[in-house]
Amino acid sequence: MTGKEFLWQYIMIDRQIRSVKLQLDSMTEVAKENAMSSVFQNEITDLKNELKNLISESAAVKRRILDRIQMIENDECRDILTKRYIEIKTVSQIAREMFMSRQGVHYHLAAGEKAISSLI
């Protein structure tokens, strides 16, 4: 696993959580409007359990990633990796916040991802 793949784990789980939340919300709405809401109850319960599991997994992955990021010596790399992979900000958002060019952000991301690769 590369450093970038390791760091992307949290983003992927976050996307799964959002997807399950959307499914759960739509299923709940259908159950409210439908006279056969008991039919949907098992599916709603399954989605709630899946959401709980994903949130637990997300917390564990986030902790592992943050532990590795904290091992990097360069402060800017740490900040940029945290903003990109934990706060899930775009390169443009990070560049604006840190008063840096997008190329500078990409440079630090690449350096940080390489450093993470050596730590995993």
Residue spans of the language-model regions?
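N-terminal interaction/assembly modules
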Residues: 1-71, 120
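Short alpha-helical "recognition helix" segments of helix-turn-helix
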Residues: 93-98
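DNA major-groove recognition helices of helix-turn-helix
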Residues: 101, 105-116
